[in-house]
Every structure is written in structure tokens, then in C-alpha cells.
Amino acid sequence: MADTIFSSGNDQWVCPNDRQLALRAKLQTGWSVHTYQTEKQRRSQCLSPGELEIILQVIQRAERLDILEQQRIGRLVERLETMQRNVMGNGLSQCLLCGEVLGFLGSSSVFCKDCRKKVCTKCGIEASPGQKRPLWLCKICSEQREVWKRSGAWFYKGLPKYILPLKTPGRADDPHFRPLPVEPTETQPPSAETSRVYTWARGRVVSSDSDSDSDLSSSSLEDRPLPSGVKGTKGDKPRGDSGASMESPRLGPARPPSHLSGSQSSLGSEAGTGATEPQGGTPAQPEPRVPGKRHTWATPRY
């Protein structure tokens, strides 16, 4: 029984005998449930990785909450400092906050209990309306009391640790308002319709400088490709700079050289008068087309 109670076993919950207690007293090691442990028992009492992970998560969550609390107090302090920077009056003859003139000719004023400054009734807050003598506070002092109340500074006798909010940069540096990059458009090769329109327009420009409508038909005939096997009668004839009409095709024997000694203006006038028909007459019937010949369609001038 005594051996069971005062045994020198390895059980940490059993008190050792007097001999071992005296020996431990001399060695200044003492005895407790923690010191009287074997290495095996110490290893069995180590925390598992899951328990360590849970403890670390609790510590990290507490740190995040602490940072959020510091940021909340920092926003309150920033708001109070902004109000203190925006004062416009001197607090004597003017309202401390809005700068309005006080006195008989101005607005009625109240006296702040904390800062001992005068403010108008719009910038003042009545702190104790139930008392016989009302207690007025300016908005700055009222905000300061609110900061001390909501941050716990009244308990710690001072503001706790806080983090001021960061200054927001300008909106020009914001990536959502940056203009989107414009992609270069692919150039398409000109189609056949575009080239046909350009040829038609070129023919119209050439024909607009002529003196008669017969030049339109001659210029369009020159632009058309001739069929294979047919020899063109175009030749190397020079075209007039002033856009005069081309020489009519030769249907008969060649004219004598004396007929070509006239000026280009006389040729243009003769061609114009020859192309027009007398009023009241019937229009000339078109002749059948013959390969190698040109037909000039004349319209009456008005």
C-alpha cells in the first residue's frame, strides 16, 4: 500500500517518496507534474500539426481584426483633422467654422464649452438640452468627443494605435478611364468596281472640258479596248491643251494640207456648227457600225 502510494514509478501524478524528494531538493530540481516527466511522456504531449494550424489561424484572425480596428480609428481621426483644417473664422467676431459675422447685425452666437470659441447656432450642437442652462459644443469638439468614445480612448486615457487612410491618387492614373488602344485597320485592295468608277469619272472630267457633247463619245471610245484583229485608227494624234474636239475620222480621201492651216479655235467652231442640225429638221439616223470606223453622235445645242 505504501509502495503503491509512494512508489518511484514513472507516473507523473504520483508523488515520489521522501528520499527522492530530499534528493530533488538538494539538486534544486523540485517536483511537479511537469518536471517529473520522461522523454516519452513529453513527446506524447506535443501538439499535432492540425492543432498548430488552428492556433495559427486564431492568431492571424486576431491580427486582421486588430488592423481593421486601427484603420477604423484612423478614419475617425482623419475626419476630425479635416474639420480642424477647414475652419474659416476666428471664433470671436466670426463663427469658427463657417466664418459668418456674429453680433447684433449678424447671426446669434453660442459659446462652446470645450474650446471656448464662439460659433453660430447652425454650427453649434446642444449637448444637454434638458438642463436649465443649455450646454453648447461646436462641431469640432463634438466630433472629438465622438472619436474618444468610439475609439476607447476614454478608457486608455489616450488615443490607441491607429492607421491613417492612404491618399487616393488622381483619376487620371486609374486604369478603367484610360483610353483603349486602337487596333490598326487592315487595308483592303481596291475592287474592280472602284476601278470602273474611277475610269468613268476620268472620262467625265475629260469630257467636261470639251466644247461639244461629241467629245464625250470620242473619249469613251478611246478608253475602250479594241477587239483583237482590228487595227485602231487612233494613231499618234496630239490632243489640244484646251480640250478641243478631236478630228473626225476619215471617211473619204485625205483633205489637202491647206485645210489644216487654220487655228484650233476655228476647227472647234466648224466642228460644233457641223455637228448641230437646223431647227425643225429630223435628227440624223445612226449609221451601222463598221469595224475600223468611229461614229460621232451629235446633240443639238440650246
From Swiss-Prot:
GO terms for molecular function: LIM domain binding; small GTPase binding; zinc ion binding. Highly expressed in pancreatic islets. High to moderate expression in adrenal gland, pituitary gland and ovary. GO terms for biological process: exocytosis; G protein-coupled receptor signaling pathway; glucose homeostasis; intracellular protein transport; negative regulation of G protein-coupled receptor signaling pathway; positive regulation of insulin secretion; regulation of calcium ion-dependent exocytosis; response to xenobiotic stimulus. Residues 41-158 form the RabBD domain. InterPro entries: FYVE_2 (IPR041282), Noc2_FYVE (IPR041857), Rab_BD (IPR010911), Rabphilin/DOC2/Noc2 (IPR043566), Znf_FYVE-rel (IPR017455), Znf_FYVE_PHD (IPR011011), Znf_RING/FYVE/PHD (IPR013083). The keyword Repressor does not apply. Rab GTPase effector involved in the late steps of regulated exocytosis, both in endocrine and exocrine cells. Regulates the exocytosis of dense-core vesicles in neuroendocrine cells through interaction with RAB27A. Acts as a potential RAB3B effector protein in epithelial cells. This is Rab effector Noc2. It comes from Mus musculus. The gene is Rph3al.
